[in-house]
């Protein structure tokens, strides 16, 4: 009789349904602590959560899955929502993520797709967050900033005026990390469109003249711009 009563109560009070994708996306972003940047959703399935992760214009989202049918479903969903480009998806092939080192602000792993943890951490930017789904919830791990990366906060490195950074990762360029607009300056033999670049706290700060490129005689439009130093 007790078993029957318990079963009756279970039927009368069903378990709560999983959170809808927009609510789940908001919860995951709050748990991550990331306020903007590049999100990669590993194991994106049909793209329902992938699309919801772009809660505002501060985020750009990319979904990855080995199942091409799921990628097609994700792309169809993104096109229907008119957000393709701001949110994208591609098929995962091989055992490496198709991303350069230190690029991603939030790596959301719903299904590891056979990718190991060192490879996941490789693509995270310093300060980036890895959220991994488990049977009991989501585990959070932060990639700490390496001690051998330095800031350049003044014209000559820092307030001391000594133009030597304490940075052992600086070296000749080996790959293109990211591209940021505008692609052309206003003129080739006048004042540079970009000047006074400094860095601090994982950000690049610079002054950019975004005035018309039709003629250098037109008024300038100087702007102070801040970008993520690792992915723009």
What do the predicted segments below correspond to?
Residues 34-51, 58-62:
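Conserved class I S-adenosyl-L-methionine
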Residues 74-75:
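Conserved SAM-binding loop
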Residues 82-94:
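Conserved SAM-binding strand-loop segment of SAM-dependent methyltransferases
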Residues 95-106:
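A short acidic, Gly/Pro-enriched loop at the edge of an enzyme's catalytic core
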Residues 115-129:
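A short glycine-rich, Lys/Arg-flanked "PGG" loop and its adjoining helix->strand segment in the class I
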Residues 145, 150-181:
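Blade/loop signatures of beta-propeller domains
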Residues 158, 203, 210-212:
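Residue-level signature of beta-propeller blades and closely related beta-rich strand-turn architectures
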Residues 167-190, 213, 217-232:
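Extracytoplasmic/lumenal domain signature
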